[in-house]
Amino acid sequence: MSAARTEAALWVAQRVTALLLAGFVLVHLATMIYAVRGGLSAQAMLARTHASAAWPAFYALFVLAAAIHGAIGLRTVAAEWLGWRGRGANATVAALGLALAALGLRAVWAVTV
């Protein structure tokens, strides 16, 4: 894939993940507000996440979108502010994105399984 195509694909991925994150944040906030106003404790909320297959899937997708979005954003910041480009920068940012995804998925697993 050419450099121009790679940049275009990353640009699209950044915008798509931003759109997904907006939806995920709205659902998360609405759910938390509804649960707290309904008098649910943290323990009761966790019990409900354990009983559903939808919540782990929702939060796993949320984490993956955030990790991808964050990694692409860090790559852009490194290039624009630090002048750090090339394979080394790409590999470092990819490793950070994978680490963020792994930590986030571990957190999802911890509260839903």
Tell what function each PLM region has.
Residues M1-V113:
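Membrane-embedded alpha-helical bundles that constitute the cytochrome b-like, heme-associated redox core
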